[in-house]
């Protein structure tokens, strides 16, 4: 039951068992109710419910046999009937709450009302109108490659922003990003700074309750300089270091030598005359849009379960990012390229630069991660983002626990045994409002575990 009293927490609950390795297939099987399409009612439906003028999205699976209706509504098992074009069912949650649906189906569209009854407050049910359509199917044919030159850059991860390009699962997009200050590869400032993003990209068939898969096939430099800072952010300072750093907040320009694969200071001090760092291009921002019901639209410097300004230095060429879909089309944003960055983005700005980017998208239908998951050739990584390092640590741990439970059907005790012996933690972000902590597990440790589907 999606309790009305805690709707915005529970309606985005995790349902993502069946996610497979980046090297395997991502076409996760839909539940049996969606596969059995023996009537105009059976299938996977996307519901748009009207909560006091705000759209809230759900998924439900229906199976009709001889007038009897079974399936699930947002994870709650349902039973009901079909009489002509009229459907009626009741779904029940583990706490005893219910969702009662009465609707009609006409020309492939369902409409009607839901009555939500909270087990803790049964005397005050709430009634909401809805419409629903069968979940869209993947487009047939060969995946396309798109060349996209951005002309508009948004500074919010909003579901209201107009998509710049529509793509299908399996498609690849080649594009560019400006740097965090809004400057492009030619040194031309195109937009006000503040992590302006390329996108959003509308991904066909991606619906709330799905997982968006973003494979970064190319993250390359497209200019030879970057801007950073010479200070340390407040989370990294104690009293004595803070006093030493009080006058240190000026910009520092770096030279990017792609041929040698290193970055050096353009005007180094005597002690740093021979100092260099390896180039490791990354994207600070990869995000899907939060839902229309979000209390506030996050700016492009913010982060959360939708991804956003994660500033995680493993979001590099070859990485795959899994993000929850919370609005139709997912609305994918990318930006904030860094030529190199230490853990935490300790200076406040990394080596900020524009970037040449190519990515491929996919959709895992009916399964959703609770927050960003990053996969490399060697590790699976759960990103936790919250207001303090302690809270981000908890988020990363919970996200990985959910992933292990869903993928391998582990019990809580088994999850604890795996995490207690295999977890590797990194502080990924300390520069912005939310801190970031990442829990990594080497994938070799997990190879002996049977997946949930195999069980």
PLM ranges: what are they?
Residues 6-21:
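Bacterial N-terminal signal peptides
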Residues 18-31:
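Signal peptide processing junction and immediate N-terminal pro/mature segment
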Residues 28-122, 126:
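Central antiparallel beta-sheet cores of small beta-barrel/beta-sandwich binding domains
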Residues 140-189:
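N-terminal, Lys/Arg-enriched amphipathic/low-complexity engagement segments
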Residues 149-158, 190-197, 298-306:
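Short, structured beta-strand/loop micro-motifs enriched in basic residues and often containing a Trp
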Residues 167, 203-206, 315:
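Short, well-ordered loop/turn sites that connect or cap secondary structure elements
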Residues 211-365, 405, 412-413, 418-436, ...:
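Glycine-rich anion/phosphate-binding loop at the beta-strand->alpha-helix junction
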Residues 371-388, 392-401:
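Extended amphipathic ligand-handling, pore-lining, and cofactor/metal-binding catalytic surfaces
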């Amino acid at each position: 039951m999606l309790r009305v009293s805690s709707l915005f927490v529970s309606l985005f609950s995790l349902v993502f068992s069946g996610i497979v390795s980046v090297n395997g297939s991502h076409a996760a099987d839909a539940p049996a109710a969606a596969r059995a399409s023996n009537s105009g009612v059976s299938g996977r439906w996307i519901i748009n419910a009207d909560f006091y003028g705000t759209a809230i999205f759900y998924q439900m699976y229906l199976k009709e046999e001889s007038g009897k209706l079974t399936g699930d509504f947002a994870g709650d098992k349902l039973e009901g009937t079909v009489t002509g074009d009229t459907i009626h069912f009741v779904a029940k949650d583990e706490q005893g709450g219910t969702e009662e649906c009465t609707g009609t189906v006409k020309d492939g569209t369902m409409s009607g009302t839901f009555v939500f009854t909270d087990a803790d407050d049964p005397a005050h049910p709430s009634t909401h109108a809805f419409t629903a359509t069968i979940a869209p199917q993947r487009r047939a044919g060969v995946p396309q490659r798109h060349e996209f030159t951005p002309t508009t850059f948004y500074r919010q991860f909003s579901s209201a922003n107009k998509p710049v390009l529509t793509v299908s699962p399996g498609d690849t997009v080649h594009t560019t990003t400006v740097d965090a200050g809004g400057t492009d590869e030619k040194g031309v400032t195109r937009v006000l700074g503040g992590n302006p993003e390329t996108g959003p990209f509308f991904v066909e068939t991606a619906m709330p309750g799905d997982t968006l898969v973003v494979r970064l096939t190319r993250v390359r430099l497209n200019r030879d300089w970057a801007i950073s800072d010479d200070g340390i952010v407040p989370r990294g300072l104690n009293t004595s270091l803070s006093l030493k750093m009080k006058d240190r907040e000026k910009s520092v320009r770096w030279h990017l030598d792609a041929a040698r694969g290193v970055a050096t200071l353009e005007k180094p001090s005597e002690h740093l005359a021979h100092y260099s760092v390896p180039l490791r291009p990354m994207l600070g921002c990869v995000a899907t849009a939060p839902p229309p019901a979000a209390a506030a639209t996050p700016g492009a410097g913010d982060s959360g379960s939708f991804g956003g300004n994660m500033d995680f230095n493993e979001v590099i060429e070859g990485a795959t990012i899994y993000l929850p879909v919370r609005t139709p089309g997912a609305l994918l944003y990318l930006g904030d390229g860094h030529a190199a960055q230490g853990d935490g983005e300790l200076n406040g700005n990394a080596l900020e630069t524009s970037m040449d980017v190519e990515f491929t998208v996919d959709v895992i239908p009916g399964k959703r991660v609770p927050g960003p998951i990053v996969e490399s050739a060697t590790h699976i990584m759960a990103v936790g983002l919250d207001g303090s390092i302690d809270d981000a640590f908890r988020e990363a741990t919970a996200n990985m626990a959910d992933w292990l439970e869903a993928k391998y059907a582990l019990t809580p005790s088994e999850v604890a045994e795996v995490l207690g012996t295999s977890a590797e933690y990194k502080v990924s972000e300390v520069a912005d409002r939310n801190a970031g902590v990442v829990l990594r597990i080497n994938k070799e440790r997990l190879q002996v575990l049977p997946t949930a589907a195999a069980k």
